[in-house]
Structures are given as structure tokens and as C-alpha cells.
């Protein structure tokens, strides 16, 4: 399991967007990854990878997905670990 080492707001530097509703009020962020249709989710206590579903209550109607981005979700996780933003629990 991966957990954040920094405040969740720092994930905005990597393109994460604050979740909507109660999730956003609790400082949760997400990033949709077109390659592989995954959604990266970070809260103050955990980091998770989910399948990207359009009806997910955490995601805005206009998602923050960069379709021209050639990275996979694993590439992004590797970059977050390398940037010292995530650690293993």
C-alpha cells in the first residue's frame, strides 16, 4: 500500500484535481489516466488506483484527463515515488 508523504494539495503539481463533494472537502484529489483507463486517487491517508468510471462520485463532469499524455498510471506512480511524494506503508 502506498501513502502520501506530503500534503495532498502538493499533488496538483502533477496534474491532480480536487475531488468534488464530500471527498473534496476532505482534501482528496484524483487524476484520470487515459492510457489504461485508470483513476489515481489520493487522500491524506492513502493512495489508490481505480478503474476509471464516468459515474464515480469523486470525479467532475469534465475530468482532468490529458489524452495526449503518453504516460501510463505506473509511469506516474513511479514519478511520484521518485519525487518523494509517496512511500510504502
What are these regions (language model features)?
Residues 15-16, 28, 85-86:
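Short glycine-aromatic motifs
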Residues 76-85:
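Short A/G/S/P-biased low-complexity tracts
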Residues 1, 85-89:
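Short intrinsically disordered terminal tails
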Residues 10-12, 81, 89:
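Short polybasic/polar patches that bind polyanions
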Residues 2-20:
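Amphipathic alpha-helical segments
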Residues 19-77:
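Acidic, low-complexity, intrinsically disordered interaction modules
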Amino acid at each position: 500500500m502506498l501513502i502520501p508523504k506530503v500534503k495532498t494539495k502538493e499533488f496538483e503539481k502533477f496534474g491532480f484535481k480536487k475531488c468534488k463533494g464530500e471527498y473534496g472537502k476532505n482534501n482528496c484529489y484524483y487524476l484520470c489516466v487515459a492510457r489504461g483507463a485508470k483513476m489515481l486517487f489520493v487522500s491524506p491517508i492513502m493512495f489508490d488506483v481505480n478503474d476509471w468510471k464516468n459515474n464515480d462520485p469523486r470525479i467532475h463532469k469534465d475530468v482532468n484527463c490529458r489524452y495526449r499524455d503518453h504516460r501510463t498510471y505506473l509511469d506516474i506512480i513511479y514519478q511520484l515515488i521518485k519525487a518523494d511524494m509517496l512511500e510504502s506503508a
